[in-house]
C-alpha cells in the first residue's frame, strides 16, 4: 500500500525506526536532538505516494521508501525490525509495489540504496536484475591527535 494512505507521521516514524536499527551495528545513531533532526529532515524528503508499506497481520512489516532524486528515484528498503515475522516476503511485496508503480509512471530506472549485509534487502538485491555502478562505503579510522 502507498505510504500516503497511512496516518500522518507513520511513514516518517517507520523511516526513523528502520534507519536506526539498520545502522546500529556499524554506525549507531545517537539519541541527540541533532541526530533526530537529521533523520526527520530525510523523512521529509520521502515521496509518500510512491513509498510502499507491506503489512503482515495488519501491521507494517517492511517498507520500500522512495526519494524523488534527479536522474532516478532512490529506493531504500528493509523490514521494520530485524526480527520482523515474514520479513523477506513482506519486503519482496513492498519492492515489487514500487517497481510496478515506477513502470506505471513510465520510469525506466530506480536506484536502490542498501547494504549487501542488510538481513532482508541484501538477499533480495542478489535476486534482482541490478545493473550499473555499485558503491562501497569504507570507514577508515582516523588516529586521534595528541
Label each PLM-derived region with a short phrase.
Residues 1, 97-146:
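Active-site/acyl-donor-binding loops of N-acyltransferases
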Residues 1-31, 146:
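Short amphipathic alpha-helix that is part of the acyltransferase structural core
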Residues 8, 85-88, 118-119:
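Loop/helix-junction capping segments adjacent to catalytic residues or to phosphate/diphosphate-binding pockets
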Residues 15, 22, 59, 65, ...:
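Amphipathic alpha-helical "stalk" segments
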Residues 23-81:
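A conserved beta-strand-loop-helix scaffold within acyl/acetyltransferase catalytic domains
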Residues 55, 94-99:
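A short, acidic, amphipathic alpha-helical segment used as a generic capping/interface helix at domain edges
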Residues 62-64, 89, 111:
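Intrinsically disordered, low-complexity regions of eukaryotic RNA-binding proteins
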Residues 80-93, 104-105:
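Conserved glycine-rich acetyl-CoA-binding loop
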Amino acid at each position: 500500500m502507498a505510504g500516503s494512505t497511512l496516518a500522518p507521521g507513520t511513514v516518517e516514524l517507520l523511516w526513523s525506526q528502520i534507519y536506526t536499527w539498520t545502522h546500529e551495528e556499524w554506525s549507531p545513531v545517537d539519541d541527540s536532538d541533532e541526530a533526530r533532526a537529521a533523520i526527520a529532515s530525510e523523512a521529509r524528503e520521502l515521496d509518500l505516494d510512491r513509498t510502499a508499506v507491506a503489512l503482515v497481520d495488519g501491521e507494517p512489516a517492511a517498507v520500500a521508501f522512495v526519494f524523488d532524486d534527479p536522474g532516478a528515484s532512490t529506493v531504500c528498503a528493509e523490514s521494520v525490525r530485524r526480527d520482523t515475522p515474514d520479513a523477506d516476503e513482506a519486503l519482496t511485496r513492498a519492492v515489487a509495489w514500487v517497481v510496478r508503480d515506477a513502470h506505471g509512471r513510465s520510469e525506466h530506472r530506480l536506484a536502490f540504496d542498501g547494504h549487501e549485509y542488510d538481513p532482508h534487502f541484501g538477499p533480495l538485491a542478489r535476486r534482482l536484475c541490478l545493473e550499473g555502478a555499485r558503491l562501497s562505503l569504507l570507514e577508515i579510522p582516523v588516529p586521534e591527535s595528541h
